[in-house]
């Protein structure tokens, strides 16, 4: 099979290679990949900015596909069923995190795309227990967005616990930021603002508007704190979701959130140390939570939202490429002048 492989450590070293179709174990299934999305993680591995990965490895973890083969002890699935899969591969099942329903935090976890071979290929194998059925009304194309939507669900619903009536500001117009903003509206937020900078004005801020986020702000031209103060009678935002990972935006979150408010952090900085106005968090007595990965209930929630059309991400996908055109696809994902970039396998 054809696969896009990170062959060794360092910037670049990504190439199409002929790889064997995965051999499945008794508790696994083989999946024919239909669509698979480029995530920031894939970009960071490509540029050698992701802290952990084990080359040679097939990249990719956001996918939708069809079961074509079952392990001998798999009885809960049939060939031909359409599925998506969680990323908690190789978890131990015995540690405190696994036994309390948080396999995403297991130290033994090796996710597809960095720890084990991923979905930028014709086929991927997955443990049967990590699969979710795609509702009949949801296309393979849209289902490929389940993983980033589940990550967004974890940040907003499970970690930040957004409430009806909250004034929410989302910092960052990448796919995750836009999905979180849409989910905040679904949750009944009184207002949702999403912010970008000059480079986002001609595309991503407009894309957010197209996807139903009316209040878009270019913080390169608008004083965000003054704007939030005007809209909240000087109180500040109830919840700020930081989805950029850049230092100015992180500090902006501390400026615009209200006293006793919440900051949810999902953006991953490119550097390990930042200059953050920590005292503002202390004096405001803020709730600060970080979010990474997703849980079972996030996947079931997202698929139900897709099924009943409460969450429609059709327009978030702006570019599709064949795997052979991976260089163009990665260029488009890196230049931030698009929404979600998918490979159609």
Predicted regions and their residues:
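Glycine-rich phosphate-binding loop and adjacent beta-alpha segment
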Residues: 203-209, 214, 247-308, 345
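Glycine-rich beta-strand-centered segment in the early N-terminal region that forms part
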Residues: 22-36, 50-96, 135-137
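C-terminal hydrophobic helical "lid"/dimerization subdomain
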Residues: 3, 179, 222-223, 239, ...
